Design a protein with these regions (language model features):
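Conserved short alpha-helical segments that host acidic/polar catalytic motifs at enzyme active sites
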Residues: 2-255
Length: 255
């Protein structure tokens, strides 16, 4: 599992900061192979795009520009969730980023942190319920996730969660991860996330948020890209940190 680094209210993947590294003991084809016992989940392809912003007064708009630059990674649906430390708001829709997020819509997403997702079209059903970010209320508060990748042990993980009382609202494998976090017996949220990621197999990059924190992680072999950028604060303001599936998302943000 990827190491997670906690810094103030920002949680990042330490191995991503250190740079990419070679896969150990697995090939890309093995990671992308489907589990024989897998249920008919809606598969999220590696082309999906994820974006996260931490520490900007207009985080949703910054996330919008990042997703706009990542539009080539997915044209089926897009979504943004933002938070101001007290409340999380999210808006999702079918279509292109620019079609969904007009200026009026972005004004409904206040806050200094945000995550976003743009989804690649699949051969399965195209439905708004599978658009991301996905949010779940848990005993540790609201958690929202945007995920890019392919998990190969969905069937067994889902069956175990359902035996423990989990109720699934989507057919997205991303909900497996967020349910594993919500059902973890660990004491702190960061430990719950680490615990959940040890239980999934495959290739993934993930950005998550609560009402006041951002988390980012990727699979231990680095099969799915996740880059980290920084926007220098002006006039004494703190720096803004951002995460994206590709560094092209940072260009419009001057990161």
């Amino acid at each position: 599992m990827s190491d997670l680094l906690v810094q103030d209210e920002l949680v990042v993947d330490k191995k991503e900061i250190q740079g990419s590294f070679a896969p150990l003991g697995m090939t890309a084809s093995e990671v992308d192979a489907e589990d024989e016992d897998e249920t008919p989940f809606d598969k999220l392809r590696e082309e999906c795009g994820v974006m996260a912003i931490h520490g900007h007064p207009d985080a949703a708009r910054m996330t919008y520009w990042g997703l706009y630059a990542l539009q080539h990674r997915g044209q089926e649906s897009a979504g943004i969730a933002s938070a101001d430390g007290q409340q999380v708001n999210d808006i999702k829709g079918m279509g292109l980023v620019s079609e969904i997020f007009t200026d009026d819509v972005l004004e409904k997403l206040p806050g200094h942190i945000a995550i976003g997702h743009t989804r690649y079209s699949t051969t399965g059903d195209s439905a708004l319920l599978n658009a991301q970010p996905i949010s779940v209320e848990s005993t540790r508060g609201l958690i929202a996730i945007a995920h890019n990748g392919n998990l190969i042990n969905l069937g067994t993980a889902k069956e175990r969660l359902e035996r423990d009382g989990a109720i699934f609202q989507t057919t997205s494998d991303s909900e497996i991860i967020i349910q594993l976090i919500a059902h973890s017996a660990k004491n702190t949220l960061i430990d719950c996330i680490a615990d959940a990621l040890t239980q999934v197999q495959g290739a993934f990059s993930i950005v998550m948020m609560t009402r006041n924190r951002i988390f980012a992680a990727r699979d231990p072999h680095g099969f799915r890209p996740l880059a980290m950028g920084r926007i220098e604060g002006k006039d004494g303001a703190p720096d803004t940190f951002c995460f994206a599936s590709e560094t092209c998302a940072f260009d419009l943000l001057h990161a």
